Amino acid sequence: MQKYIVEARSLLALAIPVVIAQLSQTAMGVVDTIMAGSVSATDMAAVAVGTSIWLPAILFGHGLLLALTPTVAQLNGSGRRNQIAHQVRQGFWLAFCVSVLIMVVIYNSDHIIMRMHNIDPVLADKAVGFLHAIMWGAPGYLFFQVLRNQCEGLSKTKPGMVIGFIGLLVNIPINYIFIYGKFGAPALGGVGCGVATGTVYWVMFLMMRWYVTRARSQQDIKLEKGFAAPDWQVMKRLGGLGLPVALALFFEVTLFAVVALLVSPLGIVAVAGHQIALNFSSLMFMLPMSLSVAATIRVGFRLGQGSVDDARVAAYTSIAVGLMLACVTAIFTVVFREHIALLYNKTPEVVVMASHLMLLAALYQLSDAIQVIGSGVLRGYKDTRSIFFITFTAYWLLGLPSGYLLGLTDYIVPAMGPSGFWIGFVIGLTSAAILMALRIRWLQKQPSAFILQKAAH
């Protein structure tokens, strides 16, 4: 039992800074929305529309680079720190290639926005302007993620927390300058949010670059030592590990986006209640997501040390801690659901709808914790292809179809509206949790030589 307690402490020490870093990123989006909304409702809506296109694109790149964390953790655990710099340099090349692809997609996103049904032309122009501004921050964001993944692979999660918080503080005055046109800058409104956020991503990268070159714990990792040409074999391996994770993230983000579109014809009350419940559950999701990052680090590090048993302890401990936290957040959600809904909106009908959906949100928090932490464990084992197949099956073949049938049709029961889609979320996330758990169990039953060879690949 003692080893599980020690492992739990290590996991929480890694996870807490990740939570704070994620909150900083979320708060940056909230600040953009509030400050754009102070100009006009059109500017706020333009930021929302632009973000709905930007987020899946940049998260795809983010997911692709997550392969670096277990790679660095495994090299660190096995005492091969001299190989880390080369992996990170190739991570930069991969980030550069992906950022170019993302910028091309975002630059041409005006075709998507202009074809949206009944979209206001002014709103469309502002949304396109927002995207054309923020896309220049794509390389900065992904370069920052490369160095953040290096630090996290070395069990250093605090730098990402500190720099994320500084990024939030920097974002506010830059927003102020470009949204309202201060100090000689043009008043860009919602487009200014894109300029500010893109700038902040580069600032965060430069701060992280400054940290890794001066941190005593990383003096032996010489990133700046000469020019490193692309190593296509390493890039292919990193891309092969990261692509399933990137696609899994893309499936998850687009699932919620599609459900939002399907709910939109059901009326203002349904849409508002759905959005409130989804926003709050997304905040609660940050806790197990941070444990997922910690699980990847700990499992990868233990496998690097050649200890399959310790990796198993790290995996089970992370899931157990996640379940305990999920029980707390689920109880909190059930008890205070009406009070939480009132913080968002005072309309009685909306509060009733949101409160009802939060009951379902509380129900799926347990399975959500298992599936997201399970995904982190599998990343630690470098078993990322299974993550892709599990998420695709659970979300798109089980969750979304069942939600659609329950929410909008009378085939099974009378159409349930938003509640039907949330039951679909429960089905999808529970299916993912079961499949993740089964995959982890299967993997841990394999011979130690097989597990270690897979992790060392």
Curated annotation (Swiss-Prot):
Keywords: Antiport, Cell inner membrane, Cell membrane, Ion transport, Membrane, Sodium, Sodium transport, Transmembrane, Transmembrane helix, Transport. One of its GO terms (cellular component) is plasma membrane. CDD domains: MATE_NorM_like. It is found in: Cell inner membrane. Coiled coil: none annotated. The keyword Cell cycle does not apply. Its main location: membrane. It is a multi-pass membrane protein. One of its GO terms (biological process) is sodium ion transport. The keyword RNA-binding does not apply. InterPro entries: MATE_fam (IPR002528), MATE_MdtK (IPR050222), MdtK-like (IPR048279), Multidrug-R_MdtK (IPR022913). The chain crosses the membrane at residues 11-31, 46-66, 93-113, 127-147, 160-180, 188-208, 243-263, 278-300, 316-336, 350-370, 387-407, 418-438. One of its GO terms (molecular function) is antiporter activity. Multidrug efflux pump that functions probably as a Na(+)/drug antiporter. Belongs to the multi antimicrobial extrusion (MATE) (TC 2.A.66.1) family. MdtK subfamily. This is Multidrug resistance protein MdtK. It comes from Yersinia enterocolitica serotype O:8 / biotype 1B (strain NCTC 13174 / 8081).
